[in-house]
Amino acid sequence: MKNNIINLAQDLIRRPSISPADQGCQQVIAERLAQLGFTLEWLPFGDTLNLWAKHGSGSPVVAFAGHTDVVPVGDETQWTYPPFEARIVDNMLYGRGAADMKGSLSALVVAAEEFVKANPNHTGTVALLITSDEEAAAKDGTVKVVETLMARGEPIHYCVVGEPSSGKVLGDVIKNGRRGSITGELYIEGVQGHVAYPHLAENPVHTSLNFLTELTTYQWDNGNEFFPPTSLQIANIKAGTGSNNVIPGELYVQFNLRYCTEVTDEIIKNKVAEMLAKHQLKHRISWNLSGQPFLAGNGELVKATVQAVENVTKITPRLDTSGGTSDGRFIALMGAEVVEFGPLNATIHKVNECVSVEDLGKCGEVYYHILERLLKS
């Protein structure tokens, strides 16, 4: 299995699929799956290519999800090995996307292939959801596929997302949920004027200080068994013209909350509105909800994944919900139990991104064992 995974990973890495470009990656995968009797459905939206592939029928539907797009390489001269050469050095596979996530995507594909070969009459459905729009806008990828499936009443019961979840060693972390993410774009209005005549102006920076203190120190919740407390961070703040003699007429504040299941986006919006009213600030605000929090808890997929990781790596993984958002947030909206498991994330989005060849082989074994537990005939 390992050699097949590495060969496929190298083929995919050599295709410079900067998001949302796919550069033929999904076609390579589709041709392999078609030979094994998978039904293929292409779901293009905008400039994004999506593939929905299935083998078998009925329940449960166990889906593997991944993406073929990668982030830009940056200054290519800083790379020790060319980012799209897919070179193996000292048992490490180097290249953009090696860890995030062409390596684990290859492991997902090969695991599905091997399972179907060994169990042609398996119960339920093996599915793969592959997109080229995860790293950039995430507007025409998994979210659109999920909308399509939901519109026709087609379920996903369990989903393994192959994101690089591991920290220090393969298998030390399984993501069994993710926090929600919401961003506020706030404009506090004042009156512009000369700094020598403050009585003729209103400085929005000064009038907002008490509000900003309350906003940044407010305790939203205490977290729970699975999530840390909700956190808020100011990401950007701007006022003034750049001149030292002009009182600004407007203050711009952009802030983001990573929130747990103890609060909702509506609770957050209402509380911020309450604070703004309390401090009598003339303002306008807009919100961008990137994703709701989701949690798989200790369900069947979590149990199957933990058991598979223990069998393959001989270590007991820690269940964790920290970190950024992933496409799992969209799939969870279907009522699916979602976990993320994949290789080490130490080099993702970095120069000299790389992944252990041995770890990719073990990832494939873990994915295979998950299918065995949930679908074996």
From Swiss-Prot:
Binding site for Zn(2+) 2: 100, 135, 349
Residues of the active site: 69, 134 (proton acceptor)
Gene Ontology biological process: diaminopimelate biosynthetic process; L-arginine biosynthetic process; lysine biosynthetic process via diaminopimelate
Keyword annotations of the record: Amino-acid biosynthesis, Cobalt, Diaminopimelate biosynthesis, Hydrolase, Lysine biosynthesis, Metal-binding, Zinc
Entry cofactors: Zn(2+); Co(2+)
EC number(s) stated in the UniProt entry for this protein: 3.5.1.18
GO molecular function: acetylornithine deacetylase activity; cobalt ion binding; succinyl-diaminopimelate desuccinylase activity; zinc ion binding
Pfam families: M20_dimer, Peptidase_M20
InterPro entries with a match to the protein in the record: ArgE/DapE_CS, Bact_exopeptidase_dim_dom, DapE_proteobac, Peptidase_M20, Peptidase_M20_dimer, Peptidase_M20A
Similarity comment text for this entry: Belongs to the peptidase M20A family. DapE subfamily.
Function per UniProt: Catalyzes the hydrolysis of N-succinyl-L,L-diaminopimelic acid (SDAP), forming succinate and LL-2,6-diaminopimelate (DAP), an intermediate involved in the bacterial biosynthesis of lysine and meso-diaminopimelic acid, an essential component of bacterial cell walls.
Protein name, per record: Succinyl-diaminopimelate desuccinylase
Species name: Actinobacillus pleuropneumoniae serotype 3 (strain JL03)
